[in-house]
């Protein structure tokens, strides 16, 4: 099985929704490398499951970065640009303007630019995690030619 690097981010109003999604999918997520912004990562690391009467914390291996507004979104964006993130699950609150909306915009732009699997809602996240390509050893993400073309442009 291919081990993916998955970034998990949620705005305050959607953190519990992401925690529920992670709880539901803990059996899959526990086999991958997880990264999250500060508080979101703390909540995910505290997810408790009971197997054979024993409490377990299957996602406590998550790597916590800074909180989104203090640089966590940019840390994840840098990881995307460096090819270190395969999937971004970002449950964003689109009903309010975030104080760090420029960081959020930059993060979503990089996810699109570098062609990573990217979900902003539970339905899309469900589609990604249940796709046969999700942990297919033979599948390779294609980096758009436009990136190489831009890097090699004549000035």
Language-model-detected regions and their locations in the chain:
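Short internal beta-strands
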Residues: 31-44
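Mid-chain, well-packed structural core segment of small domains
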Residues: 68-109
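Short, glycine-/small-residue-rich phosphate/pyrophosphate-handling segment
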Residues: 123-155
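General beta-strand structural signal in soluble alpha/beta enzymes
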Residues: 35-37, 64-66, 90, 118-122
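Active-site rim loops that border cofactor/substrate pockets in soluble metabolic enzymes
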Residues: 47-75
């Amino acid at each position: 099985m291919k081990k993916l690097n998955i970034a998990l981010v949620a705005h305050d109003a959607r953190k519990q929704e992401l925690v529920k999604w992670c709880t539901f999918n803990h059996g899959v997520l526990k086999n991958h490398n997880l990264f999250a912004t500060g508080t979101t990562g703390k909540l995910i690391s505290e997810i408790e499951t009971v197997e054979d009467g024993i409490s377990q914390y299957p996602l406590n291996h998550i790597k916590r970065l800074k909180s989104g507004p203090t640089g966590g979104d940019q840390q994840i964006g840098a990881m995307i640009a460096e090819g270190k993130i395969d999937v971004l699950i970002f449950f964003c609150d689109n009903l309010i303007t975030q104080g760090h909306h420029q960081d959020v915009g930059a993060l979503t732009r990089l996810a699109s630019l570098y062609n990573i699997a990217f979900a902003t809602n539970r339905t899309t996240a469900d589609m990604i995690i249940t796709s046969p390509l999700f942990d297919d050893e033979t599948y390779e993400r294609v980096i758009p030619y436009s990136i190489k073309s831009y890097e090699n442009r004549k000035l």
